[in-house]
Structures are given as C-alpha cells and as structure tokens.
C-alpha cells in the first residue's frame, strides 16, 4: 500500500509541470497583451464592446484607426478615458496598435433586429446610403465607403456591423463639432446637410444590414466628382508618423546656441505648458487651473504681434529672471519664474535663440480668468514682496560637481519643486518643506516626497537606477504614471546621460532630515469584513496581469508587493491609477509599453475602496485602509 502511494506521489510530481496545476498562464509578449487596455472596453480582439458604445476595431483600415487614435489624443474627438490612455504614447506606437487591430480578420455577429422604424424610413436610409441626395449635395455613402460598405483603403472605415446608437452618436458629433478630423473634414460637411430624420434613416438601415462574408476594406475606386472632393480618400487623414528631429539623450554642440536652447527647452518641458491639446507647438493657450482662477499660457512662437518675435534677449531674460514681461507687467507665478530665476544668463540666451527659430503662429494670448483681487497687479506685487526674490541659487559647498549640476537642473529649469513642494494658502512654495511632497494644484494626483523613502525618495537607489528611470519611466521599483509620465515623455528622456546622472546624484544627496515625520505604516490586517471581498475583486480584475501574489511581470506589469504607489500614506495615486488606468510613457528606450485599463466604469466607490484596502494590506504590504470618502473625493474635481 505504501509502495503504491509512493509511486503515485512520484508520478504526480513528475507530471505536475505538464498538468499546469496551480500555475498561472504563461505571459506572452504580444500586441494582444500590449493592447489589453483597449480590449477592456472594445471587447476581446477588438470585436466591439457589449453595450454598443465601444465600436469594433478588428479589421478596420489601419490608417483610419491611426487617425482616430490621433484625434482622441489631440482633442478632435472627445472622450477623457481615451485621451488619458493615449497621451503618453508616440505616433509610431499608435500606428503599430492600429496595424495590429486592422490585421484581425474576425467574423461579425448577425445584426440586431431593427425596432421602432417604418418601411419608408428604411427605404430613405437605403437611398441615402446607396445613391445620396443630389438636391442636398449629399453623396452616396458607397462613393467613399465602398460598394459593399466595408470600407476603402487606406483611410475609410466600413459602415456595417455598427450599432445604431453608435452611428447616431457619431453623426451627431460631427453635426455639433464634438467630433472633428484632419482637413479636409469631409464628414463634417456631409453631416451638416443631414436633418434628424435623415440621420435616423441612415443609422436604422445600416444597423440592419448583414456584414458580407468578405468584410475586408476594398481598394479605392473612382469618386463621384460631382458630389465629393477629388481627394475624398484622404478626408480626415493624418500624415504618417515621423521620428523626432531631436534624439533622446543627444548632446548639442556647445557652439550651436539654438541647438543648445532646444535641449534646454526639453529640460524645462516648455512644450508641455505652452501647447494646447492638438494645437500648434509653443503657441500657448493652455489653461492652468489654480485656486484663484485660470491662467493661460502665452504664445512663445516668433510671431511679432502675439508671440515673442519682437522681444530681445534682454526682454526674455527679464521674464525668466525677474518675472516681468517686455511691457514691465508682473507675471503670474503659474509661469514658474521662482524656479527659472536660478537660470544662468547664458542658458536664458540659448533658450531664447531656440524659441526665435520656431515658425510664427498668429494666435492671440487668452486673458486670464482670475478672481478679484488676485487678478490685479497690486495683489501680485504684494505676493512677490512676500515670496519672491530674484537671483541664482547657491548650492551647498559640500556638494560634488555632479550634485551641484543636478541642483541647478532640479531647482532651476527642471522646476521639480513646482509640483513636489507643498504650498501655502496664497500658492507660494514652502521652503522648509522643499521637495517633501504635495497634492498637485487643482488635481487629484499627489507629487510624492523626493526625500522620504516611503514615497519618492531615492536614497537607497543607485544613481544609475534613478537615471534609467528618468530615461524610460520604468523600473523594478516603480513606474511613471499620471502627470509624471508626461514629464518623462516630453522632458527627462531627452536629457544627456551626464545630466540625468547629475540629477540622480543631487536627489540621492537630498535625503536630508525631514521637517515632518513620515506617516505610520498602518496595519496589515485589522480583520475588516471586506477583506475577502477585496480578494475577490483582485481575482476578478487584477490577478491576470499582476499575478496571484502581486508579483507582476518584469517590464510589463509592475509588482504590487512593496510598491510605493500602493503603500504610501496618501492613497490618491493608487485610486487615480485604478480609476483611469494608463500607459507608461513610450520613450526611445522603452517604445512599446504595456497599459492598464481604466476601471472607473466598472467599480463603484465601495468596491474601489475595498480593493485598494486589500492591495495595501495583502502579501507584505502595510498601509492604512482606504475609505469610500477617499474614493469619492478622488473622483471629483477639486
């Protein structure tokens, strides 16, 4: 008996790897895995979401999908979940995603039976789709979308297999201007000629049609020149992706003043604030919300009327160093001149030389919308008298040359303290708490302390680890998400190796005694009744990526064990990440990141609090529970 039992045990051990018992599915590095943030809403393999709101992606022309990804990222189409997911991604990665979904040739489900319609309405819809209406100058849909209505290469999508509600929403979006495209925006012009009855007729008829067996887009055919533009197949299409002309980590020649300035503009991430979503680079107009109202960034292009084309290098130095415009107006510190005042005159002149090379864009500067008395120059003068002194910073004499260079970058053009240093009631930085963490102004993200080990401190990191994180946004110790992903994407990845190492050296040397004590770790298990509920939520929503023990997948999905975003005293970043998902930045050294889907539509406040509390107490994590109030406040705009 014992011999038989022993043989069974030996056999079971031998077969265990083959049986796969107790093992998690093997991780597959594929585009299907990299686009899980997409399929979460658009269905497995992009077959379409279950509610009719998220359309099918599979099999659509790649150029069309690419255009739509750009439109969402750049504000021509409006859906905050999509915009947030796509902001850290490059054009080339968006094209790769589009090509992946375009290559999926999957069967369509049968059409949903049409309700609340009449034969006359369906006949009108068929006429508009197949023949158009010459009197209204409405071309037939088939002229562009193909005789089979399955789309036309390279840019025109198919119209079949789409829910009626989705078709109505898109036509309505074009009519109201909520949906736009690159010019020529043919659909906006055509949709404007459709009345409500025509929109309903078209959507009813299209939604009732069966998708043909060959659902692939067809090659382009001759367009009806009497009703549509000659370049109809290019309507709304964007140029192909191009590579940045300024390579990440390249070091400009010190004698090339404008090239040096272009590098410094990357260090300061000037583009990030002085460009609106989808707007011309450096043309300004981006609104920066503050507790006192909204400040709009200025036009930095070479236009003489609305930009800085008529400025001198002395005018620019005055703005950077003293916070005064060319006309002597005092500037609002939403423009971080309290940090830029540390910039050297040579670097200011180089930055100005670069800005003068930017093509002129005539775009008037938008007036600020600040409340009284904050909108007055007198109030600003009082603020400056209290909190601003122009002048270069004097780093500690005990710092190495590398650390001194790092201090110049971190506290000057890099203006890290703008987010990471707490502010007082009047919006001034509190020097005694420099870089010790703060809620970002008018946002629900928390900029962690760069000194506290429990938050964003790097005292136990090597300088190489810090430099690599600034270059890629990815580390075994954590990833860049939220606003920091934008900083890595547009700024720190472009720094030279020497400058990143200098910043790392200074940040490691900045683990000075902290004026406020670090918050306690909380508890691992207080016996909350919701612990099992949290484990169930983790099983349902998180385990497939982050693993049964929160171990994650190196290079793809971060470990949750010991993750500071999970365990830091302020839980806001954890809550925001679960709510909105996101990608790590697509950098030159990490160009194809993996993403996390948003769960804002899947989890209510109680569920999200329960899940967050579980993450903060499971495995070896120790942090205080998250309450429903924490989640509710994180969902709301300040």
What are these regions (language model features)?
Residues 7-17:
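Bacterial N-terminal signal peptides
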Residues 18-22:
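Sec/Tat signal peptide C-region and signal peptidase I cleavage site
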Residues 23-35, 44-47, 80-150, 172-257, ...:
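Flexible coil segments in periplasmic/lumen-exposed cytochrome c-class electron-transfer proteins
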Residues 28-59, 64, 68-71, 78, ...:
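N-terminal Sec/ER secretory leader and immediately downstream segment
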Residues 51, 295-302, 445-450:
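Acidic/histidine-rich, surface-exposed loop or edge segments in extracytoplasmic proteins
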Residues 59-62, 68, 161-163, 170, ...:
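Extracellular/lumenal glycan-associated surfaces
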Residues 463, 561-606:
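Extended, polar beta-sheet/loop recognition surfaces of beta-rich domains
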Residues 533-576:
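C-terminal structural cap/anchor segments
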């Amino acid at each position: 008996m014992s011999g038989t039992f022993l043989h069974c045990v030996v056999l079971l051990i031998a077969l265990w790897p083959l049986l796969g018992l107790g093992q998690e599915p093997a991780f597959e590095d594929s585009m299907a895995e990299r686009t899980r943030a997409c399929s979460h809403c658009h269905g497995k393999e992009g077959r379409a979401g279950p509610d009719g709101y998220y359309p099918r992606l599979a099999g659509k022309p790649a150029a069309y999908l690419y255009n739509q990804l750009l439109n969402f990222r750049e504000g021509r189409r409006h859906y905050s979940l999509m915009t947030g997911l796509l902001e850290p991604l490059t054009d080339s990665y968006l094209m790769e995603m589009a090509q992946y979904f375009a290559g999926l040739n999957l069967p369509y489900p049968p059409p949903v039976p049409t309700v609340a319609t009449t034969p006359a309405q369906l006949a009108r819809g068929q006429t508009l789709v197949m023949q158009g209406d010459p009197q209204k100058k409405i071309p037939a849909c088939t002229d562009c979308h193909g005789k089979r209505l399955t789309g036309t290469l390279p840019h025109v999508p198919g119209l079949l297999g789409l829910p009626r509600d989705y078709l109505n929403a898109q036509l309505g979006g074009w009519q109201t201007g909520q949906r736009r495209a690159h010019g020529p925006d043919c659909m906006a012009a055509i949709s404007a000629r459709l009345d409500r009855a025509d929109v309903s007729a078209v959507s009813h008829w299209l939604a009732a049609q069966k998708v043909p067996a060959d659902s692939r887009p067809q090659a382009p055919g001759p367009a009806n020149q009497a009703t549509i533009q000659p370049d109809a197949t290019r309507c709304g299409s964007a140029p192909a992706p191009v590579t940045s002309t300024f390579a990440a980590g390249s070091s400009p020649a010190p004698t090339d003043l404008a090239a040096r300035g272009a590098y410094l503009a990357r260090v300061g991430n000037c583009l990030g604030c002085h460009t609106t979503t989808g707007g011309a680079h450096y043309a300004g107009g981006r609104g920066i919300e503050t507790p006192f109202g909204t400040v709009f960034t200025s036009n930095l292009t070479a236009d003489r009327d609305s930009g800085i084309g008529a400025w001198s290098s002395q005018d620019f130095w005055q703005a950077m160093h003293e916070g005064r415009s060319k006309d002597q107006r005092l500037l609002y510190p939403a423009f971080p001149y309290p940090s830029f005042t540390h910039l050297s005159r040579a670097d200011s002149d180089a930055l100005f030389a670069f800005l003068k090379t930017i093509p002129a864009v005539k775009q008037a500067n938008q007036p600020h919308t600040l409340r009284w008395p904050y909108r007055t120059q007198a109030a600003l003068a009082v603020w400056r008298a209290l909190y601003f002194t122009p002048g270069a910073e004097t780093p500690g004499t005990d710092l190495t040359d590398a650390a001194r260079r790092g201090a110049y970058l971190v506290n000057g053009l890099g203006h890290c303290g703008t987010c990471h240093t707490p502010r007082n009631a009047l919006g001034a930085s509190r020097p005694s708490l420099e870089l010790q963490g703060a809620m970002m102004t008018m946002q629900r993200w928390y900029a962690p302390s760069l000194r506290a080990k429990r938050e964003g401190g790097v005292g136990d990191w090597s300088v190489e680890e810090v430099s690599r994180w600034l270059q890629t946004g990815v580390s075994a110790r954590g990833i860049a998400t939220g606003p920091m992903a934008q900083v890595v994407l547009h700024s720190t990845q472009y720094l030279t190796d020497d400058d990143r190492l200098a910043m790392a050296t200074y940040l490691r040397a900045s683990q000075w005694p902290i004026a406020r004590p670090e918050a306690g770790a909380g508890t691992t298990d207080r016996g909350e009744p919701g612990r099992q509920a949290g484990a169930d939520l983790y099983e349902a929503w998180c385990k497939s990526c982050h693993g049964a023990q929160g171990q994650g997948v190196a290079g793809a999905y971060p470990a949750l064990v010991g993750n500071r975003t999970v365990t830091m005293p302020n839980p806001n970043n954890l809550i925001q990440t679960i709510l909105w998902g996101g990608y790590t930045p697509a950098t030159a050294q990490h160009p194809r990141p993996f993403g996390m889907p948003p769960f804002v539509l899947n989890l209510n406040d109680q569920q999200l609090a329960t899940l967050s509390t579980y993450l903060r107490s499971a495995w070896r994590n120790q942090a205080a529970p998250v309450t429903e109030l924490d989640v509710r406040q994180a969902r709301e705009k300040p």
